[in-house]
Amino acid sequence: MRKLIYILILAAAFTACEKSQDLNCLVTLNVEIDGQDAPISVAADHSLAGTMFRNINTLENYTIPVIAGGTTQMQVLKGIYMIAFDADAILADGSSRRVRSSQYSSPEKAVNLTGDNCTVTLKLIVLQ
């Protein structure tokens, strides 16, 4: 009887691990700035309350990584996401700009990340 219980527990553990891997997707974030060349780097300002990369199904928040060379990759749970942030962008000519990404800032505008590999292009607006 005890062996049966151990076997059931191990089977459940292995099944749970396999399912959790299927729930993850690899997301590639690309950035554009109002028709300008892609920035060398974009660093989100996480001190602002409106900065988010939030799964609206689970309400889990992810840290927006530094986007270097106009692109970055991150692994998140599959779901529907709101993405919004203000950031400091450094352009190829060395100048810096304060930018905002708000195209996916509400549940109505949220982006669907349910495939295994998803690409999201963030259109940044220059603030100053």
Describe the role of every protein-language-model region.
Residues 88-128:
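Structured interaction patches on ligand/partner-binding surfaces of diverse proteins
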Residues 33-37, 52-55, 89-91, 126-128:
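Beta-strand elements of well-folded, non-transmembrane domains
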Residues 27-33, 53, 74, 81-83, ...:
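Hydrophobic beta-strand residues in large extracellular and virion-surface proteins
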Residues 6, 14-36:
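Bacterial Sec-dependent N-terminal signal peptides
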Residues 72-97:
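A short, solvent-exposed beta-strand micro-motif common in secreted/extracellular proteins
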Residues 1-5:
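Bacterial N-terminal signal peptides that target proteins for export
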Residues 41-48:
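Short coil-to-beta strand junction motifs in C2/discoidin
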Residues 49-80:
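Tryptophan-paired
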